[in-house]
Curated annotation (Swiss-Prot):
This is Major capsid protein. GO terms for cellular component: T=2 icosahedral viral capsid. The gene is ORF2. Capsid protein self-assembles to form an icosahedral capsid with a T=2 symmetry, 35 nm in diameter, and consisting of 60 capsid proteins asymmetric dimers. The capsid encapsulates the genomic dsRNA and the polymerase and remains intact following cell entry to protect the dsRNA from degradation and to prevent unfavorable antiviral responses in the host cell during all the replication cycle of the virus. Nascent transcripts are transcribed within the structural confines of the virion and are extruded into the cytoplasm. Binds and removes 5' cap structures from cellular mRNA. The keyword Metal-binding does not apply. Keywords: Capsid protein, T=2 icosahedral capsid protein, Virion.
Amino acid sequence: MSDTPNSDKVACGRKPMFCEIIKLANRKRLILDTTGERVYDARINYCSTADATVQADCHIYWRLKLRRTDAVFEEYTGQGYALDTASYPQQYADIIRGYYSKHVSSALAANTQHFVNVLAMLRHAGACIAHYCMTGKIDFDILSKKKHKNKEVVTLSSADSLSFLPHSALYLPSALRASDPEIFNVLYLLGCACDASIAMDNIANTSGAAKYAMPHYNPLQLSHALHVTIFYMLGLMDSCGYGEDAVLALTAGLHSVTTVIAHSDEGAITRDALRELSYTQPYGTMPVPIAGYFQHINVLFTTQPAWDQFAGIWDYVILATAALVHLSDPGMTVNDVTYPTTLTTKVASVDGRNSDIAAQMMHSATRFCDIYIENLCLFWGVVANPDGNASQALLHAFNVVACGTEPNRHLEMNVMAPWYWVESSALFSDYSQFRSPISSAGYGPQSIYGARLVLAATNSLEFTGEAGDYSAYRFEWTTMRHNPLFNILNKRVGDGLANVDFRLRPFNEWLLEGQPSRRSCDAVGHGTPTATCNHKTPNRNTVDEFIWGSTSCDLFHPAELTSYTAVCVRFRNYLSEADGDVRVLNTPTREVIEGNVVTRCDGIRCLDSNKRIQHVPEVARRYCMMARYLQARTFGALTIGDDIIRGFDKVDKVVKMHKSNNRLGQMPLIDVTGLCQPMIETSTARASMTTRIDPNRLAAATARIELPLAPRCTSSLIPSSDAVPEPEPHVGEPGNGSGCA
């Protein structure tokens, strides 16, 4: 068997990646009135290896909703991406020659290449299956866009023996109907929806017109037939060397009907691009399928799967194809350090469109599309063709989004991190096969289903000293994502991020920090119980006031709270009161901070409510000093040149999943059998402890020394923050010293 596209011998035994994990969400799914909406919840446990009492559970909520009830009936125009070079391999050509010999001379059939294109049918099949999952409705009208009743079919039984089917005909031979009537009938309906010129060997003549009479199917039978037909068409296109075009068309169809709510606003730009994909009319001969091309596609082991089980399969597929956007971020290199792709501009938006951001997004999309298509092929179990056109088709769709007549709200900001649609953690049982430059740099998934993942608790850091109630560290920060310990502090009661601050350095050296309105608010009574704004407590400038605070995903966005220079962080260990009482805050010890964190997923479940994820985080997306720093490093006179954003020369295909830790070596993946049982919180030190000391000695100890500050730079290429020119404040914004909030 060969894995070469369009080889003479068709390689069988391919296995889509959705087969192993689909049993996770086994709770009953609901249909609410005329709209379909579901929320899936994954619980991920983070636990310190140095102290098992330092642990917390984080939740990821994936929300799917029906785009609109008539989305599946979207008008087919026949315009779009054209594919004219997909020819069958010899093994299929030999089968097809037997069909044509009945209608053409043997010599003509033997010397003819047989081409096929069912991309439009695959896109509509994806739309139909998504519609069924969200509404529970599927019938002949949906599959054919109400065109099957009036469709005239060309019959070949009475044709001239020397006649030959035109290149544009969709030929459904009788051999296929005898072999698999389910596939035959669904192909006919999908061909009707896509205005194909359908030809058959012989059918009944009704009222003087050749029309095909469909046998009866109930919805359960029809859904199974559609499921099997999808993989039949994928197999045909993959055997011709165009499997990547096929899986892209199918993915576009799935997301044309369902809306996966993004975990970041601009991350949904990929959804917009997928919806712009369209294809020309289908054609080709549909041969009897070669047995075993795909393995285990009938994961329900029944020909009439229950709607609840069937929806679970394809809900997962929809989520997984959206999560691949995160894994496919090509990244960017700043001072030899890889960061998530972040685009910045000081150009203002005009009529809801920022042309500079759109241009930068298109440049980054060139590399993103190549990686995304490669990962999509791996997920579906088809061969990625290095000479294929799928990435160019997707790139063209991005261009339509960026340059279309209608403004796109995802492109109207001054700072954006485009390649993060939804969180990918816990959605796959194996990430190592994917091509993911962003994961190799440590911004990828933080949990693998069915295994434990060991991560460094914090990014490379240096302990710089203690003074009074505090201990200080110098972090090679990069982003919040690089510090899994903060996931524990954010979700653990009693010693959270409110005891961590950045007061040793200015507060304006951040990109994409959260809750900016709090720090810039000047409302009457701000920070008091009588405030006219929503800020009833005073600003503390602690870490919890800089994060996004998203309720749909407890994990930090890969680009959340980005810094391109080192950061000094204070951890408050004690709370000293005026009367001499000292409360132990139970802040993580140095061993915990410098140690490791083990993560595991306890499963995915389907919820019946989305009330807990209605909050939308507030994120600063204006051009600030750190954005100026990024552009200076990108387009300045540095030796690293344009590879920071434009070339990506320093980011390449890698096999390891996470960046090596300077203290502990390569972070291993530890496999376990079956599900890990959830840990029980055993800490007995949650209650505040009080110790009586001499207030005078406490004051003297606090004032005796200043916390030492480690040097900010590790390279002569990295200037201090003072060397970076600040942008001029916008009209109505505070001046210097107020940060980018």
